[in-house]
Amino acid sequence: MRIVVGISGASGIPYAVRFLENLRGHDTYLVISEAAKKVIQYESDENIEYIRSLASHNYEDDDFSAPISSGSFLFDSMVIVPCSITTISKIAAGISDTLITRAAAVSLKERRRLIVVPREMPLSTIDLKNMTYLSENGVIVAPASPGFYTKPKSVDDMVAFVVSRILDLVGVGNDLIKRW
């Protein structure tokens, strides 16, 4: 399975790291935004080199010659995790000024699965309208909202819950959580 992964500048880097760790064996194409690089320094015990090592292919966010910027390059899904509100707003407005937003635009025009994982809270009416617009256009909006019916005992358990759901959405089997 070919999966494009974008990491934008929202809080929630542990979701991205755990997601990539669980995609081993799949063909992954990773883009880390400039803002995400800063968030990684503040929020993660992992360094950028480790995160990049989890992907099969790595691209800079300004590399419009990357294959994922073209509709003729076939991939199964794109996941932006975490997805900043700025990135959601750009995608909703059709702005493709970064490789992440360009690959998202390709996903939309080619009718490929696009999943955005916002972590922001609270949300403004504008944020909600942008997410609604994306959903109406086939994007899966999967907020990073852990379930508590699994009785998580740690932050890692809560991260596992969200990542398990994202993996389910892209069709990658996993046993990160106890299922009903």
From Swiss-Prot:
Instruction: Give one GO term, molecular function aspect.
Output: flavin prenyltransferase activity
| Catalytic activity of the protein | dimethylallyl phosphate + FMNH2 = prenylated FMNH2 + phosphate
Per UniProt, the keywords (alphabetical) are: Flavoprotein, FMN, Prenyltransferase, Transferase
Where along the chain is dimethylallyl phosphate bound?
149, 165
- Is the Transferase keyword given for this protein? yes
Q: What Enzyme Commission number does this protein have?
A: 2.5.1.129
Spell out the SUPFAM superfamilies in the cross-references. Answer: Homo-oligomeric flavin-containing Cys decarboxylases, HFCD
Q: Which domain of life is it from?
A: Archaea
Q: Which InterPro entries match?
A: Flavin_trans-like, Flavoprotein, UbiX-like
Q: What does this protein do?
A: Flavin prenyltransferase that catalyzes the synthesis of the prenylated FMN cofactor (prenyl-FMN) for 4-hydroxy-3-polyprenylbenzoic acid decarboxylase UbiD. The prenyltransferase is metal-independent and links a dimethylallyl moiety from dimethylallyl monophosphate (DMAP) to the flavin N5 and C6 atoms of FMN.
Q: Which family does it belong to?
A: Belongs to the UbiX/PAD1 family.
Q: What is this protein called?
A: Flavin prenyltransferase UbiX
Q: Which organism is it from?
A: Thermoplasma acidophilum (strain ATCC 25905 / DSM 1728 / JCM 9062 / NBRC 15155 / AMRC-C165)
Gene behind the chain: ubiX
